[in-house]
From Swiss-Prot:
The keyword Metal-binding does not apply. One of its GO terms (cellular component) is cytoplasm. It comes from Francisella tularensis subsp. mediasiatica (strain FSC147). The keyword NADP does not apply. Its EC number is 2.4.99.17. InterPro entries: QueA, QueA_dom1, QueA_dom2, QueA_sf. This is S-adenosylmethionine:tRNA ribosyltransferase-isomerase. GO terms for molecular function: S-adenosylmethionine:tRNA ribosyltransferase-isomerase activity.
Length: 338
């Protein structure tokens, strides 16, 4: 299976650099994965596609203000993208610099002193030596780490709009974007309809934006992300399945978390890392339907939806979305695949 099979041509003007005024004002492309039938709706119509007894599973991870700036002791400028926090003074980060800082060197994160303890590929392990910890630095100086394809600096409204309304557990470098469409009003309508809701956590890493760079899909090494699928979520899923309801994952992060926890055919609580890679030929044991945004060409995420719905059907749906001028990527429109 070739990576190029998952390529498509996207007019640049369809990349959504800014959110719509209202979260739930997006469009929703409905795709029947059995028949390939495609239909155009508003996102608020989603309430009509779910039934009492269904279970929606959301990722409650919160985006960190992960972009920070600083310098070397020489004054040379540094830009940080915090990837993972080990403890309040120890964290992994990407560093953009004219010349990479050496292991053992002392640098500044904003105006706070830090030491480079280790480097693995493009990832640095830093320890803060000053009084402030990384959480305080992010709170005081941090920026929302918008995806590179938006080609703009973050603005004040992004701090709210690049978070889901139910975000709780701090740790992501990127938003679980399928959830961005859900307003507080829509969440209430879902509850009022008798549809059950559950929350898992997957802290999205920066690897989510990386295109697959090997020719053969199966050779790709997936990045690892931290997930939590609690026992009560597993109980809800088992109950839903027993009663004939559907498990509907909100976003590919929820899909990957649930399928990690259900890899043995039975959903079990899971806490730890996952590097699960779902591509055509892989089996889904837990998820019956999903809400997802439109994904980058040749990405692991377009491979995931192609595994769920069949590659030809996905490519046709994407061609339809382009012809109908849907908005793409993080601040773009969504699909309901069932």
């Amino acid at each position: 299976m070739k990576t190029d099979d998952f390529d498509y041509k996207l007019p640049e003007e369809l990349i959504a650099s800014y959110p719509l005024e209202n979260r739930d004002a997006s469009r929703l492309l409905k795709l029947n994965k059995q028949t390939g039938e495609i239909a155009d709706y508003k996102f608020t119509d989603f309430i009509d596609f779910i039934n009492p007894g269904d279970l929606l599973v959301f990722n409650n991870s919160k985006v960190m203000l992960a972009r920070l700036y600083g310098s070397k002791t020489t004054g040379a400028k540094l830009e940080y993208l915090i990837e993972r926090i080990k403890n309040p003074k120890l964290f992994e980060t990407h560093i953009k610099a004219n010349r990479s800082p050496a292991i053992g060197s002392e640098i500044y994160v904003e105006s706070t002193h830090a030491k480079v303890l280790d480097k693995d590929g493009g990832m640095y392990l830093l320890e803060i030596q000053g009084d402030k910890d990384i959480y305080q630095l992010m709170e005081e100086f941090g920026h929302i780490p918008l995806p590179p394809y938006m080609k703009r600096d973050d603005e004040e409204f992004d701090a709210e709009r690049y978070q889901t309304v139910y975000a709780q557990d701090l740790g992501s470098v990127a938003a679980p974007t399928a959830g961005l469409h859900f307003s507080k009003e829509l969440m209430q309508q879902i509850k009022d309809k008798g549809v059950d809701i559950a929350y898992i956590t997957l802290h999205v890493g920066s690897g989510t934006f990386k295109p697959v760079q090997v020719d053969d899909v199966e050779s790709h090494k997936m990045h690892a992300e931290v997930i939590s699928v609690p026992v009560e979520v597993c109980q809800k899923i088992r109950q839903t399945k027993e009663n004939g309801g559907r498990v509907i994952a909100i976003g590919t992060t929820s899909v990957r978390s649930l399928e990690t926890a259900g890899q043995n055919g039975q959903i079990e609580p899971y806490q730890g890392e996952t590097d699960i890679f779902l591509y055509p030929g892989k089996k889904f044991n837990v998820v019956d339907a999903m809400i997802t945004n439109f994904h980058l060409p040749k990405s692991t995420l377009i491979m995931l939806v192609s595994a769920f719905a069949d590659k030809e059907k996905i490519i046709k749906a994407y061609e339809h979305a382009i012809a109908e001028r849907y908005r793409f990527f993080s601040y773009g429109d969504a699909m309901f695949i069932f």
